[in-house]
């Protein structure tokens, strides 16, 4: 839809696990969940890098996630922690959200998990970026909760 209705717009897709990498639209149906952690910082960093090279004024990030950042790359090594929300990883992730806000890049997060502690994190992430969040589970994609920190709204949609 984006490429046909808005031919001057671009759509870049980034997958992120331990690292982040761009993928082509045609390869999206073949993307699989891997034995990875979630390096949200790397995904956002790559997205910002791609957007900085674009000459358009309307820059946005749409992120689909389970809401649980569990990995950082420090030099050549990975710092991983899958147990709970690690403050070191969370703080770096929130720093990326704040960086995007300062660059004028809103993040719309589609969270596909119902865990209350992960929803609290996504809420904090969304507030830090002044972005938007949609909450759902994989089994309930027809119903989701929408939070808009730009307009300070929260509502349930079906």
What positions do the PLM features span?
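Von Willebrand factor
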Residues: 1-25, 43-44, 57-64, 108-117
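Arginine/glycine-rich "motif VI" loop of SF2 helicases in the C-terminal RecA-like domain
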Residues: 3-8, 52-53, 98-105
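Switch/connector loops and helix/strand junctions flanking conserved nucleotide-binding motifs
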Residues: 21-25, 55, 69-74, 117-120, ...
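Small-residue-enriched hydrophobic alpha-helices in membranes
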Residues: 27-30
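VWA/integrin I-like adhesion module and closely mimicked acidic/polar interface patches used
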Residues: 37, 67-128
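Structured catalytic core of nucleotide-sugar glycosyltransferases
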Residues: 37-43
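Von Willebrand factor A/integrin I-like adhesion domains
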Residues: 106-158
């Amino acid at each position: 839809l984006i490429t046909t209705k808005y031919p001057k717009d671009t759509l870049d897709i980034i997958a992120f696990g331990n690292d982040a990498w761009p993928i082509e639209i045609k390869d999206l149906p073949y993307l699989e969940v891997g034995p990875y952690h979630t390096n949200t910082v790397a995904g956002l960093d790559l997205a910002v890098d791609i957007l900085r090279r674009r000459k358009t004024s309307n820059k946005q990030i749409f992120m689909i996630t389970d809401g649980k950042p569990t990995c950082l790359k420090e030099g050549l090594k990975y710092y991983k922690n899958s147990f709970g929300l690690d403050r070191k990883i969370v703080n770096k992730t929130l720093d990326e959200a704040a960086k995007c806000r300062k660059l004028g890049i809103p993040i719309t997060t589609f969270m596909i998990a119902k865990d209350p502690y992960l929803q609290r994190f996504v809420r904090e992430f969304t507030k830090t970026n002044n972005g938007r969040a949609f909450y759902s589970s994989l089994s309930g994609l027809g119903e989701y909760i929408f939070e808009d920190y730009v307009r300070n709204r929260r509502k349930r949609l079906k």
